[in-house]
Amino acid sequence: MKRNGSRNCLNRRSRFGSRERDWLREDVKRGCVYLYGADTTTATTTTTTSSSSSSSSSSSDLHLVLCTVETPASEICAGEGRESLYLQLHGDLVRRLEPTERPLQIVYDYLSRLGFDDPVRIQEEATNPDLGCMIRFYGEKPCHMDRLDRILLSGIYNVRKGKTQLHKWAERLVVLCGTCLIVSSVKDCQTGKMHILPLVGGKIEEVKRRQYSLAFSSAGAQAQTYHVSFETLAEYQRWQRQASKVVSQRISTVDLSCYSLEEVPEHLFYSQDITYLNLRHNFMQLERPGGLDTLYKFSQLKGLNLSHNKLGLFPILLCEISTLTELNLSCNGFHDLPSQIGNLLNLQTLCLDGNFLTTLPEELGNLQQLSSLGISFNNFSQIPEVYEKLTMLDRVVMAGNCLEVLNLGVLNRMNHIKHVDLRMNHLKTMVIENLEGNKHITHVDLRDNRLTDLDLSSLCSLEQLHCGRNQLRELTLSGFSLRTLYASSNRLTAVNVYPVPSLLTFLDLSRNLLECVPDWACEAKKIEVLDVSYNLLTEVPVRILSSLSLRKLMLGHNHVQNLPTLVEHIPLEVLDLQHNALTRLPDTLFSKALNLRYLNASANSLESLPSACTGEESLSMLQLLYLTNNLLTDQCIPVLVGHLHLRILHLANNQLQTFPASKLNKLEQLEELNLSGNKLKTIPTTIANCKRLHTLVAHSNNISIFPEILQLPQIQFVDLSCNDLTEILIPEALPATLQDLDLTGNTNLVLEHKTLDIFSHITTLKIDQKPLPTTDSTVTSTFWSHGLAEMAGQRNKLCVSALAMDSFAEGVGAVYGMFDGDRNEELPRLLQCTMADVLLEEVQQSTNDTVFMANTFLVSHRKLGMAGQKLGSSALLCYIRPDTADPASSFSLTVANVGTCQAVLCRGGKPVPLSKVFSLEQDPEEAQRVKDQKAIITEDNKVNGVTCCTRMLGCTYLYPWILPKPHISSTPLTIQDELLILGNKALWEHLSYTEAVNAVRHVQDPLAAAKKLCTLAQSYGCQDNVGAMVVYLNIGEEGCTCEMNGLTLPGPVGFASTTTIKDAPKPATPSSSSGIASEFSSEMSTSEVSSEVGSTASDEHNAGGLDTALLPRPERRCSLHPTPTSGLFQRQPSSATFSSNQSDNGLDSDDDQPVEGVITNGSKVEVEVDIHCCRGRDLENSPPLIESSPTLCSEEHARGSCFGIRRQNSVNSGMLLPMSKDRMELQKSPSTSCLYGKKLSNGSIVPLEDSLNLIEVATEVPKRKTGYFAAPTQMEPEDQFVVPHDLEEEVKEQMKQHQDSRLEPEPHEEDRTEPPEEFDTAL
C-alpha cells in the first residue's frame, strides 16, 4: 500500500475500502483521522440538527487519513498541504494542535477515558464518523459567521462624515470592533490615518433618506457622526444588531469569551477606552503577536478575565498592568505564582480557583487593597499565612482543598476574617491552641468533610454553621449569636448549645440518630423552622409544638406515637408528620393551629381525624392535606369537608368505600384530588361542582362508572387506570385543557373509533392495546411482566422516559430501562428509542455482560450526537437473559446505570440494590475524582453549577468531569426473586428500598404496583417528575436450565426398595412447575424414610448403585435443584403413585401372580426411586433407544407428574431416554391418557414375563401433606409397564397408531408455557 512520506501515515482516503480495513487489522495502533475542511464547518453551522455522520457524508471536503498513534500532526499537515491541524471537542472550542501532538493518540486517549478498554474496540470506534460530534479535526480553523460578527465586523462601504450634507459619500474601509467604529481615510487601506469613533454611551439611528443606511454617533457634547450605507438588508441588520449592543453599555466592556481565540484581534487595540475585557474559555498564547504579552497596551484596563485558558504558566507581564483591580485566572493549571504579583497594588479581587497551588508567595501580602481572594479547589494543606497580612479580606474561601486539620488558633490570629469556607476538604480533627474566645468569625461552612466530633464553643460570635454530610457524633456550639444551624446527614446523638440561642431562627438536625429534641431547641424563643425528620424520636415536647414563633415543623420518619394536646393558639403553618406510628391526631389541632396550611400525615396508622370546626363555623385555613397510606374509612369524610380552603387532598391507599356526594360538593376550592388505592365504586357526580379541579387520580379502585369530570373547565390530568370501567359517557365538547387521560388496566373497557376521534386532541391518551399473539411473547410471558407509571408532578413537561420489552433478542430475554433528563425531555426520548437496538448489537458481539453493557452505554452516548453536547440524562438499563455462563442459574439479570436512576430487586421479601448513585453527595469517590480534575463545584453541589451527577449520558461539554461509563452488576435470578423495581431520582428520594418493596410485593397487577409507587412518592412530598417500573418475576421450574429440568433419574437394576408414602402439605409456591425434586431435596429427613425392605437411606447406595465410571463430571445444578448435601439422602422418594386402576376388570388367572422383589401390605406399596441424577455427557454414543416412549399425564397435571420410560438396560448405561417430537407434542395435552397402544389383559402392552423390572406408569399425584404419598390399596404387581428389547419396534408401531387415532384436545392456557415434569421411575 502506498504511503505518504512516512510509514506511519498513509494517503488520504475518501472512503474505507477493503485494503484500508485489512491494513488496520494488522495492528491496533493503526487507525484513521477524519479531517474536516472549511466548507464542512459551514454545513455544520447552518444545520444544527443534523448528526455528525450526515454532515460528514454530505461534505465535499471531508476525508480520512490513515495513520498510526505515532504519527505527529506535522506529518499529516505535510501530506495534506496544511499549515496546521485544529482540534474541536464537543462542537465547542477549537484549538490549534502543536506540531508534535499525535492526533490518533489523542482520539485513543479520549475513548479510553470515556470507558472503552479493549484496544480493538477503541480502534473500531475511532473509525466511526459519528465520533465527530465529540472530537473532530480540521485542516483549517472553522469560521462561524455568528461568532465572527461578535468579534469584528468589517467591509468597504459608502461613508459620509457629519450630520450635514457638506460631506460627500465615499467608499471607505469600515470596522466595528470592541467599543469603537473605525473608518479608514483611504479606500481599502489601513496605512493611512484611522478615524476612531467611540460608541459606548452613544447612539445608532436609521437614515431614512437612504436605503440600508445607519448613523453612528459618539457620546458627549462634541459628538461625531458617521453615516454608513450597506448594500444588502442582511448586512444592515448584522451591523445594527452588533452596534446596538455596544452603545447600550454604560462602561467599556468587551466580551470575547468562548471564541477559541489565540490572540487579541488587531483592531481591538484601537479601543483604548476598554476597562473590562473578558477572554475566558479561549486558548490565549503567551508569547506571540497579539498574545497576552500585549495586554498592557490597554491603558485603562481594570478588569481582566482569563479563566479556562489552560495557560499552565502565570503570564508575568500581567503584573505590569498596574491599573488592574479585578483579575480572574481560575482553571489554568498553575502550580505556583510569581513574586511579581505583589506589584498589582490596586488589585481588589483575585480569583485563582481550580489550579494546583500549594502555597502563596509572601509578596501577595503587599496587596493591601485585596478584599476577595479565591483559592478553592487547589492543593493547599493548610491555611496560607499570608492571610494574616491581607487585612482587607473578610473571607477564607478554601473549598475543595486538602486540609485535614482545622486549627482554630490560626483563625484566631486573623481578626479581620468573618467567613470561613472549608467545605469538601479532608478535615478529620480540630485543634484548639488556647481557650481564648474568637469574637470575629460569624459564618463557618464545614460540609462534606470527615469530622467525627466538633466543638466550636469558642466561636462566641458564630451566627451560621454548615456542617452537614460529615460523620459527627457530637456537636458543641456557642449560642450567644447563633441564628442558623445546618447539621443534617450526620450521626449525631447529642447537640449541645450553651447558652440557649435566643436569636436562633432555623435549625436542621434531620437524618441523624437523635432520640429526643434538644432542650435548648425547645427554649429558643425565635425559632421559625425546625427539621428533625429521619431521626429516632419517640415523642414531641409540648414546648416545641406550642412554640409561639415556630412556623414550620418537620417530624417525618421517626417513631412518634402521640402528639401533645394543644392548649393555646399557635402560629404553625407547615406540619410534616409522615412515616411515624400515629394512631390519632390531637383533637385541638385544627382549632388551635388556625394558620396551618400544610399537613402531611401519610404513612401512619390513623383511623380518624380531628374536627375542623370549633362551633358551627370552620376557621380552618388548611390548603394542602396528605393522608395517604393510613387506615381511614368513610367516617373521616365529613370531617374533611370542614376544611373549605383545601386545594390539594390525598387520600390514597386507605379503606374508603364511598365518598358522599353531599360532602364533595363543599370542597369548591379543590384543585387536586387523589383517591387511588381504595375500594371506591363510583366518584360522586357532585365532583362537577369542583370547578377548579385540574387533577384527579383514582386508579386501583373498583370504579365502574366514568365520573363526570369531562365537564370541568380546568381539568388537565385524569388517571382512572386499574378500575372496572366498561364505557365512557362523553359530553358534546371536551375541555380544551385536558392533556392526560389514563384508562389503562380497565380490561372490560372498549372504546369505539368515534370515541377515540373525540379524544384525539389530548396530548397523552393511555389505553390498553390488545396484544397480538406472537411466538416470542409466549416464550417469556410466563417468566416476567411489567407495569409502568410516569407522573409529571408540578412540572409542565415530563422529562422521564422508560423502555420496556418483555420479549427481547428473539424472545429469550427482556430489557427494561429508565431515563431521567432532569430538565430536558429530548435525551430521555432519544435513549428510549435507540438504546435497545444498541444493546442488541452489542450482545451479538460479546457474551461478557460487563463488556456488552458498558459498550451499550458508551455507544449510546456517541449516538446522541449534537443533542448530547449540551444536554444530559441519567440512564438505567436492566437486561434479563438465559444464563449461559453460570450453570447454576436459569436466568441472569444484568443492571447498568449512570446518574441517579436505580434498580432494586426483591429477593425473598428483602430489597437488594443493584445500582450505584453517581452524585456528588452520595459518592465520595466520584466527588474526589471530579475534584482531582479541577472542576468547580458550587455550593449547591453541582459540577460547574450544572448537574449533581458525576456520570451521565450526554453533557459531553463537561468532559472529563462527567463520564458515561456505567456501573454494572450481574446476579443470577432464583425462585426467591419476586420483582424488580426501576425508579428515577425523585422516586428513591421519597421512598426507601424496604418501603418500596413492601408496598408492591403483594399487589397482583404490575401496573397497579407502579402506579402505587408514584402515588406514594407524590403524597410524601415529591413535586418533580417521578417514574416507576415494576417487573414481576416468575422464575420457577419452567425457567430451569440445569440438568435436572425435565430429566429422569436412574436407580440400580434389580435393587428393590420401599418407602412408606405419606400425605404431604401443599407446596408454598403454588406454581405447577415448582419443582418436586427441589421440594424433596429440602424437605426429606431421616425419620421420613422407611427401611423395611431395601432402604437406601445409608451408605449402601454407593455399593449397589451407579458405577463411578458412569459419572464423568459433577452434576450441573441450579438454585431450583440444589445438589444434596451430606445432611440429605442421596436418594429421594419419588412423587409417583402406583395404582391398579389402569388394569382391566376381567383379568386372567395369571394376573394374580406375585411380583418378585415388591412387598405390599394390602394398602401401600413402598417404592424408592432416585430423582436426582446426572445427564450423560454424550447422548450420541448411547445404544439405540426407543424413539417414542409412553408418558402418563393426569388431566390436572398442575397437581400431577409425568414420568418418562427407560429401557431395561438404561440404568446400567447411565443414558437417558430421549423423547421424540411426537411424544413432546402429546405431552402438552393434559387430557392425554396413559398408554399409546393396545393393552394386554393385565393393562400392559408386553407379556407379564417381561414386566417385572420396571414400573409401567405413574398416575395423578394426590395432595401432598408430608414427604410421603398414599398409594391405592391392593397394588397389583402386573401393572408395571415394561419395554423389553425384543418388543421395541412393536411398541413404537403401536404408539404411532394410537397417536394417529386420537385427537389431541386444545391445551389449557397455563399448559402452553409450562410443560409437565418428567422423572424416571426405574426400580
From Swiss-Prot:
E.C. number(s) listed in UniProt: 3.1.3.16
Binding site for Mn(2+) 1: D820, G821
Protein name: PH domain leucine-rich repeat-containing protein phosphatase 2
A Gene Ontology cellular-component term: mitotic spindle
Span of domain PH: 150-248
Native source organism of the sequence: Homo sapiens
Sequence segments annotated as region (Disordered): 1060-1157, 1285-1323
Gene from which the chain derives: PHLPP2
GO MF terms, alphabetically ordered: metal ion binding; protein serine/threonine phosphatase activity
